[in-house]
């Protein structure tokens, strides 16, 4: 398995910057668990547990004995792009913010994204990125849509995904991925 973690000093620098933004809710994602502070709204913690099955509530992020893989932020949806831009400027050289949609922002390591993961998988399977199809709707899909041979935007995709994609399909509520795969297979 391919795992890339933040250097602890870099992670601490990122945390220091993130903790200055009052309009966000922060979750630290580790290899063993995800972590939120005891001061996090209990309703948000309940929601987070739907997505992070191993979630620890901690007094301080300083006490985490785990490899930090990414930071997940929730913010008001209407503030997402503004916060992404603020983070992009303040985290230069440390991390890259990317919107995963609906007021969610991931803070990831530079160069470690879905396209990099597909490249690694392709290398193992001897499949070039240009032979792959990928589907996406959020900013965290952008590099992947750009790098594969056929990038497909979902109907609900963010505008930058739609302008980057080679093709389009309906949303996941109407089986958009399945319909597109069926179409590809029928054309062969």
Predicted segment positions?
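Mg2+-dependent phosphoryl-transfer enzymes with acidic/Ser/Thr/Gly-rich catalytic loops
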Residues: 106-188
